[in-house]
């Protein structure tokens, strides 16, 4: 079967990360954004910086979040698609990006958690009734952000954040671990 229909990548190219970054920079200052915009920006920045699946992003919990001046670290204890016996808990790191606060996932997340959603939090959903966010909801939000940025969502889905962010990082010489 492998030789009859060998696996192929979904995309032969990826979207330009600069288009999305320019769009996300325009959503600043955070204090003037509607909750839905802030939610979309936070989700997009966390997805870009972490390059994680939407399932992993939906498993992030402020109960297992440690934030310092240098960044935010999440410990993911949930069973994920990539989980296997003997493997330790997944750590998701969001380093601070003081060079450009408009694109800093760490500071955007902290503002979202501490300033905008503290009073309504049962989860990080942006519309009533504020319920737990599923991986499908996160993937849909990421697709909405791509669409708003002018990226063709008939080709690219929320999962494309993983490939686009890592491709951009490699092209800039950022080490991936």
Please report, for each region that a protein language model flagged, where it lies by residue.
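Extended, non-catalytic subsegments within catalytic or DNA/protein-binding/adaptor domains
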Residues: 1-177
